């Protein structure tokens, strides 16, 4: 579930980040923070998913209507394969297929801590999960990204400035818990007033 270093752009992105100065990183962060948020992931709970192939680090729906059981996984596919794979349209949305019931289970963990299993996410990520001070927002993010971050923090593969604060939060989470949290947070979008102000 962690970041896959065999994926070509993982190592390229690591090298780019290592070569950046502090000023370049700050400038990049400010640029990306200034981009108006637009929803691009739609979470769909289901028992079956389209059969897919992997290309360029993406799951892409096969031609036809073949399906398979989802099992305990989230499958993210472009809403429009040609727009995403061929035209590289940055506004082409994704569908995140998740197991039935995962959003509700994730809400119990995120909103209430799952009866002591973890910490309420709003404590650090803000009441709408949009971030709080230097702590990033997690609402509306790719569920694959969220699951990878949780897993990497739990396994000790992340060493960022704030990672130590997350260690007790992720310590007791199972892979299914991480899947459920990822499904729930992906299903959340910023409030309408936050969208209009560009937050």
Language-model features and meaning:
Residues 123:
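Short, cysteine/histidine-rich loop/knuckle motifs that typically chelate Zn2+
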Residues 129:
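Short functional micro-motifs and their immediate structural scaffolds
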Residues 3-120, 155-199:
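Flexible coil segments in periplasmic/lumen-exposed cytochrome c-class electron-transfer proteins
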Residues 149:
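Terminal helix-turn-helix DNA-binding modules in bacterial transcription factors
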Residues 133-139:
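Short cysteine/histidine-rich zinc-coordinating motifs and their immediately flanking basic loops
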């Amino acid at each position: 579930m962690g970041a896959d270093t065999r994926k070509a752009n993982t190592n390229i992105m690591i090298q780019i980040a290592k070569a950046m100065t502090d000023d370049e990183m700050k400038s990049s962060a400010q640029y990306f923070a200034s981009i108006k948020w637009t929803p691009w992931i739609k979470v769909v709970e289901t028992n079956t998913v389209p059969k897919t192939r992997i290309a360029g680090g993406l799951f892409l729906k096969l031609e036809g209507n073949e399906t398979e059981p989802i099992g305990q996984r989230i499958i993210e596919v472009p809403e429009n394969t040609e727009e995403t794979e061929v035209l590289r349209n940055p506004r082409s949305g994704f569908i995140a297929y998740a197991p039935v019931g995962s959003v509700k289970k994730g809400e119990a963990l995120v909103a209430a801590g799952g009866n002591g299993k973890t910490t309420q996410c709003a404590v650090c990520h803000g009441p709408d999960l949009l971030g709080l001070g230097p702590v990033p927002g997690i609402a509306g993010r790719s569920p694959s990204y969220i699951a990878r971050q949780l897993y990497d923090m739990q396994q000790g593969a992340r060493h960022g400035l704030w990672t130590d604060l997350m260690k007790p939060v992720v310590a007791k989470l199972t892979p299914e818990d991480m899947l459920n949290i990822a499904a729930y947070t992906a299903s959340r979008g910023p409030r309408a007033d936050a969208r209009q102000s560009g937050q």
